[in-house]
Amino acid sequence: MKKISWHELKPQVKEVWVLSLPAILTQITTIVMQYIDSAMVGSLGANASAAIGLVSTSTWLLGGITYAVSAGFSVQVAHNIGAGRDAGARSVVRHGLCTALCVAGILCVLGLSIHSMLPTWLGGDPAIRYDASKYFMVYALMIPFSQLNSLNSSFLQCSGDMLTPSILNAAMCLLDVVFNSIFIPHFGVMGAGIGTASACAVISLTMAWRCLLCNPHLRLNRKETEKHGFDPEILKKALKIGLPVGVQEIAMCSAQVVATMIIAPLGAVSIAANSFAVTAESLCYMPGYGIGSAATTLVGRNVGAGKTDLAKRYGNICIVMGAGFMAITGLLMMFLCPLVFSILTPDLSVRALAAQALRIGLLAEPLYGVSIVAAGALRGTGDTFVPSVMNLGSIWVVRIGLALLLVGNFGLPGMWTAMATELCVRGLLMLYRQKTTKYYKKYNKTTETSEPELLEAAES
């Protein structure tokens, strides 16, 4: 491959930054509001924080499934818009809405059916089981709105509109704090769930309005809907792209649930410290997710337009930026974490343990950034199967295996040592896949028949 001059590279770096910045700012705003949210719950005591921490991995599991549904359809939207087929993109949107709401309804019923038993299954202390159960119940009721928000946000991002989702998701965080201040004093831990659910409901409907009625590429047309009915090929492609992501999310979140079960016997202080450490770390890695979203959009649209070399270059630029950004935020958090934990909880023992664990995890931030952004770039090409297998092997073999060996002797720091090691392994695996994947060449320019070729290489 020929060398690229900085003069040629500069506008591409600028484009990545312009697309990434709104998403990064949204993620930062989201985490700041989560800090406030955690502090509001933390003021109720360590047991309240532990109750939410106990079921948090289970909420991530259900959220991961909704994310996989969004990925299966949003990548197709990016490809169609990149190829100049707006009508095709709108057809994908229609199919995505129907499918996503059906899946969300099933997940909602499933969550409601297990909420009372879940804290016991997870090995939670009897003192926190009731609050944990009620919090998870409210989360389950929120799933249809969460799915609607995730789907329409990803559609807008893949159409090139990064600003609208950024503004609305930031607004959701502000509403969350407002609603929490109303509900937490009256309902305690469950009030935090009610506040989040209320904010999500308001913003998800607003996001749907912006996507389905206002976006020039995606707004739905009744005549188009009547003319173009059900297309099984769209669902087939969504399944081939989204199913590996869904299986990955389920297996990875299941591993995180197992990790929670490993931590739970350590007591409420360790559970609360782990929950706060995860919240604090998210300020470092959420910007990586913002750049990863930009990578999916830029790679997907250029692959759809047949510009495969440019697509891969954008992916590489995003990976370097993501790793660099997260290295900086990780270094800052290394020094600032005592201040952060003093805001989140008044419990000194929780603060000390959370800071000790977090500093171990921060050592892996640059390679964690590589894994996040590389996954976004590969998703833009439709390459989801092999990255999912790599992620699954990494978290189950490395993280859980090391955790079982280390937690008994070292407690919570042992769990975070296992996690940091696994994140480094995952970053190296994803970097290797970005370098060797054939998916950038699978999608040939302009031909409709080339689209299935993108999805036939799950084995490659």
Predicted regions and their residues:
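Short alpha-helical transmembrane segments in multi-pass integral membrane proteins
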Residues: 1-23, 77-142, 178, 186-243, ...
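N-terminal transmembrane alpha-helices
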Residues: 8-39, 43-44, 60-72, 76, ...
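Transmembrane helical elements of multi-pass membrane transporters/channels
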Residues: 18-37, 138, 149, 199-203, ...
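Residue-level hotspots within the lipid-embedded alpha helices of multi-pass solute transporters
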Residues: 27-31, 64, 104, 108, ...
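Helix-terminus/linker motif at the lipid-water interface of multi-pass membrane proteins
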Residues: 32-50, 119-126, 182-187, 250-283, ...
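Alpha-helical transmembrane segments of multipass membrane proteins
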Residues: 35-39, 117, 147, 151-155, ...
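Small-residue-rich hydrophobic transmembrane alpha-helices
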Residues: 49-109, 146-165, 260, 273-337, ...
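Short runs within selected transmembrane alpha-helices of multi-pass transporters and secretion channels
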Residues: 70, 138-157, 165-176, 192-208, ...
